[in-house]
Regions:
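Hydrophobic alpha-helical segments of polytopic membrane proteins
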Residues: 14-86, 165-166, 173, 181
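Transmembrane helix irregularities
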Residues: 34-42, 145-148, 187-188
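Single conserved hydrophobic/aromatic residue that forms the stacking wall/gate
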Residues: 1-6, 10-13
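Long extracytoplasmic/lumenal interhelical loops at the membrane interface
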Residues: 93-148
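Juxtamembrane "helix-exit" motif on the non-cytosolic side of transmembrane helices
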Residues: 87-91
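Transmembrane alpha-helices of multi-pass inner-membrane enzymes
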Residues: 178-183, 194-219
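Membrane-interface catalytic loops of GT-C/OST-like multi-pass glycosylation enzymes that act
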Residues: 40-44, 136, 189-200
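A conserved mid-to-late transmembrane alpha helix and its immediate loop/hinge
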Residues: 133-165, 184
Length: 219
């Protein structure tokens, strides 16, 4: 829990100070991140940390709005990757085996659930789902799919995608950078669906109240 809170605080810090971020900021925070990695050996945290900086650099260097549209692809790519590896994992396949190893066995666990229980269109109760327990589903995309069903998962991701498209049209790139960072986190952790841990989920509110956000952005 401490690690997750720390990671979320780092993401929020970069968001609130986005316009001030520079090479010195990147260098100092990267050094701190590497020190923490040596102490905790947490690959997830350090991977997401540097991925965030890559997206920040991309946003600050690239000026073309068309090229920046790739930021909208982060959640769809994360969802597609998670679903593909869950459905087609094979321990005898060198690449899939390596991916599973890099994510500490998460793919194997999800594939085991899929083979044992399959996927459902509608939500399932915990009693049904935990009839056979194979481990923690540490992947936000597949957690919502297994628990809530395909229909709810599709609706959820469509809402997020529409939110990202709205942010893109408004040129809210720093918000897209943070969502992109959490999109990778979603492949490796399940907390991303928690609104208390991931405040960027609240951005979906612009679909209901677009005028307020657009007015603030124009100012």
């Amino acid at each position: 829990t401490t690690r997750l809170v720390g990671s979320e605080m780092c993401i929020r810090d970069r968001y609130y100070n986005y316009e001030k971020l520079n090479v010195l900021w990147c260098g100092v925070t990267s050094l701190i991140a590497l020190v923490f990695y040596k102490m905790t050996f947490c690959r997830t945290g350090v991977l997401v940390f540097f991925f965030c900086w890559v997206l920040i650099l991309f946003d600050k260097v690239v000026k073309s709005k068309n090229i920046k549209s790739v930021l909208v692809c982060s959640v769809p790519v994360g969802a597609a990757f998670s679903l593909f590896t869950t459905l087609f994992y094979n321990g005898n396949h060198a690449l899939l085996y390596k991916i599973n190893h890099l994510v500490s066995g998460r793919v194997y666990i999800m594939n085991t659930y899929y083979k044992d229980q399959g996927l459902s269109l509608f939500p399932r109760t915990q009693e049904i789902f935990y009839t056979s327990y194979h481990g923690l589903i540490d992947n936000s995309y597949m957690q919502v799919t297994f628990y809530a069903g395909i229909l709810v998962a599709v609706l959820f991701f469509v809402i997020i995608l529409k939110t990202m498209l709205r942010l893109y049209r408004m040129e809210c790139y720093k918000e897209l950078v943070m969502i992109g960072t959490l999109a990778l986190y979603g492949v490796l952790e399940q907390f991303v669906l928690n609104g208390f841990m991931n405040i960027f989920l609240l951005l979906c509110g612009i679909l209901l109240y677009p005028g307020i956000v657009e007015e603030k952005h124009e100012k």
